[in-house]
Amino acid sequence: MRAPMTSKGAQRLREELEHLKSVKRPEVINAIAEARAHGDLKENAEYHAAREQQSFIEGRIKQLESELSHAEIIDITKLSAGTKIVFGATVTLADTETDEEKRYQIVGDLEADIKMGLIAISSPLARALIGKLEGDSVTIDAPAGQREYEVVSVAYLD
């Protein structure tokens, strides 16, 4: 099954992949060559550290290539869901107790980053929001107990 991903999320992954291939991979290859020049490889900590870093970089490159090849990239600016919450929606919620507003965008699992306000489509919050409309209330089971929010606005921004 293909994993949904926003075009912006796919672009971020492509940029990371390009950086790893064009900058990090050559750096670590040079570091390995430099460490080899120091002689005995058995007790050469620089060599072993560089090889470990190379392994990490190559693993991340393979992971990113796989994620991108299995992604279903969705251009959310072309969605016409109106005020209904679907994948890609940017939702502003107001806590009904504190009136504190929070803004989240519902994205694919691979691009989720709560610090940036990006929540995974599979998260409990996103699952509770899908299908709701502006003005609807939603109850979320949070670690600190149940919280009730009102959907203040729904937008489809890139």
Swiss-Prot record:
Instruction: Tell me if Transcription is a UniProt keyword of this record.
Output: yes
GO MF terms here are: DNA binding; RNA polymerase binding
Which terms does the UniProt entry file under GO BP?
A: DNA-templated transcription elongation; regulation of DNA-templated transcription elongation
Q: Which UniProt keywords apply?
A: Coiled coil, DNA-binding, Transcription, Transcription regulation
Residue stretches in coiled coil: 45-73
Q: Which SUPFAM superfamilies match?
A: FKBP-like, GreA transcript cleavage protein, N-terminal domain
Fetch the NCBIfam families from UniProt.
Answer: greA, PRK00226.1-2, PRK00226.1-4, PRK00226.1-5
Question: What family is reported?
Answer: Belongs to the GreA/GreB family.
Q: What does this protein do?
A: Necessary for efficient RNA polymerase transcription elongation past template-encoded arresting sites. The arresting sites in DNA have the property of trapping a certain fraction of elongating RNA polymerases that pass through, resulting in locked ternary complexes. Cleavage of the nascent transcript by cleavage factors such as GreA or GreB allows the resumption of elongation from the new 3'terminus. GreA releases sequences of 2 to 3 nucleotides.
Q: What is this protein called?
A: Transcription elongation factor GreA
